[in-house]
Structure formats: C-alpha cells, structure tokens
C-alpha cells in the first residue's frame, strides 16, 4: 500500500466549520460530570459540533467505553471492559431530561464478555428514559449481542421506538472490515427484531469508500430489504488513524444522491445519504418519516 493510497487528501465537501458555542461546551461538561460516554466523541463523529451546538442532540454510549471487538474502521477503544455500572440507566435518563431531547439514541460497545451481551442494562436504560421522558422517542443501536435470540428479545420487550443495527459494509468486504461480526448474523438480527415487534421500524447503515462496487451496494440494499429493514443511512468512511483501514474512494455528493434514489426505489421508507451522514444523523427525522409511512400503509 502506498502513502498516496493510505492518506488521500479530503475533498472540499468533507471540510466542516466547527461550532463550539455554549450548548456544545455545556453538554460536554454535563457528560463528564455524570460519567457518561457518547459515541459522538468516542467514534470521532464529524457531526458532533452540529449536533451538540446547533441541534442540541447526542448519542449516548452505554456499557462502558471499551469494546471487546476490534473492527478495523472504528475509533472506539478496545480491550478488557470495566464492570457494569448499574446506575448508568438513571444517569442517562436524567441527562435526557436536562438536555430536553425529543429523540434520543442509545448505543453501546460490544460486550462479548457478558452472557446477555449487555441486553439487560440496555433494556433498563430504555425503560428509565421512558419513565423520565414519556414524550421522548427512543432509538437503540446495539451490537448483535452474540446473535442470541433471548438477548434481542430482552431489548425488544423494552419497546424502543426504533431498532438500529448496522451491517457497516457490503458482504464481500465484511470479514475484512469487522472480523468478529458476521454479515448474515446482522441480517438475521434485523429480521428477528422485526418479527418480534412488527410495528417498530428497523434501520441499518453502510459506510462507503472501503473498496465496494455499485453492484456490492445494490446487493446489500436488497439483502436489507429482504429482511424487512425500513430505514437506510449511507455515509463516507473516514480513516480515524493510521492503524485503521485506508479510504479507497471519496464519494461526491452527487453519487450519494444517486444511491439514495436507488434505495428509495427498493422500498426503504427513508434513506439518509451524504458524505457526512452517520447512523444517528438526523435520527429524529428518520423515525418520524418511518412512522408516517407505516401509518399510511395500514
């Protein structure tokens, strides 16, 4: 691999203006004071300043800040996780109150060290947020929890408003990009979630720029629709550090627009696509759109 391949210069459309107003600063202080983590920070999301400073939203990351997996695209720390914090659900719920969120996303590191994959704490966090914030919609973004059906059922029984689980990349590249997760296991996870709670929208995300072809992407879209996934997000992969997978291609906004049209033509109720789109980007709009489409179909 050449240096030119490894360090491609970012195009103009990926350059963002940072906005660190008092909302951003205040949210950061609150997260630290409550010993909470956000995927916005841990995964180095390019939209953190827009979401925190302008939209005043955030994605909480529970079950600690250390992941048991080491996916080659992800900036989250890996290693031996800490013990579970059983007070975390209430702290998340209190923070949602303080932030005045209308929609909250709750994600987590993979906890392969736990028999339930963290499902019990995940479910309790959903219930705690619901108790304190009855008018806030709740989106969950779990790992595959080892592919154990009972773990998924525990989470779905908590009745989140939307279930998000990312396949991350296309089938052909999956083993190289996320070796300890399985493409078909993720599809099965999404299918089972819909079978357990048919009225809860399901969602997944694909990163672009890892070497996939247009045919690969269309196959992935078809796979998701075959498993009744409602919402799709498409965004540009950005290399977090030298040790992570390199960017093979930067997709221009026009190509994202084309892919969005293809996705919608395949029956997704909503598709968010763009260079800076991430799984939780404009998540409140996605869940509202999906619910409206579901209501229309009845």
Curated annotation (Swiss-Prot):
UniProt cofactor note: Binds 2 [4Fe-4S] clusters per subunit. One cluster is coordinated with 3 cysteines and an exchangeable S-adenosyl-L-methionine.
GO cellular component labels: cytoplasm
Gene Ontology MF annotations: 4 iron, 4 sulfur cluster binding; lipoate synthase activity; metal ion binding
EC main group: transferase
Metabolic or biological pathway, per its Swiss-Prot or TrEMBL entry: Protein modification; protein lipoylation via endogenous pathway; protein N(6)-(lipoyl)lysine from octanoyl-[acyl-carrier-protein]
Names of required cofactors: [4Fe-4S] cluster
Keyword entries, A-Z: 4Fe-4S, Cytoplasm, Iron, Iron-sulfur, Metal-binding, S-adenosyl-L-methionine, Transferase
Residues where [4Fe-4S] cluster 2 binds: 67, 71, 74
Subcellular location: Cytoplasm
Family: Belongs to the radical SAM superfamily. Lipoyl synthase family.
Full protein name: Lipoyl synthase
Organism listed in the record: Bacillus mycoides (strain KBAB4)
């Amino acid at each position: 691999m050449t240096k030119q391949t490894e360090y491609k210069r970012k195009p103009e459309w990926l350059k963002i203006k940072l906005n660190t107003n008092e909302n951003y600063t205040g949210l950061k202080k609150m997260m630290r004071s409550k010993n909470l983590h956000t995927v916005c920070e841990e995964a180095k999301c390019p939209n953190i300043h827009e979401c925190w400073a302008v939209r005043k939203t955030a994605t909480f990351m529970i079950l600690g800040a250390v992941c048991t997996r080491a996916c080659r695209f992800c900036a989250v720390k890996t290693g031996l996780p800490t013990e579970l914090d059983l007070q975390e659900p209430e702290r998340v719920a209190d923070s949602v109150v303080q932030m005045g969120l209308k929609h909250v996303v709750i994600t987590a590191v993979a906890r392969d060290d736990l028999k339930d994959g963290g499902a019990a704490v995940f479910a309790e966090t959903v219930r705690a947020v619901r108790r304190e914030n009855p008018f806030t919609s709740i989106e969950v973004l779990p790992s595959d929890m080892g592919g154990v059906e009972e773990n998924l059922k525990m989470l779905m029984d908590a009745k989140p408003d939307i279930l998000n689980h990312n396949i991350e990349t296309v089938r052909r590249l999956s083993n190289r990009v996320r070796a300890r997760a399985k493409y078909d296991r993720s599809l099965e996870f999404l299918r089972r979630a819909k079978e357990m709670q048919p009225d809860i929208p399901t969602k997944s995300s694909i990163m672009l720029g890892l070497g996939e072809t247009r045919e690969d992407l269309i196959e992935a879209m078809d796979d998701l629709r075959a498993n009744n996934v409602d919402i799709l997000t498409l965004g540009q992969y950005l290399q977090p550090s030298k040790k992570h997978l390199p960017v093979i291609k930067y997709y221009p906004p026009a190509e994202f627009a084309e892919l969005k049209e293809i996705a919608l033509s395949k029956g997704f109720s909503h598709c968010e696509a763009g260079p800076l789109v991430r799984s939780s980007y404009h998540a409140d709009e996605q869940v509202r759109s999906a619910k409206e489409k579901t209501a229309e179909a009845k």
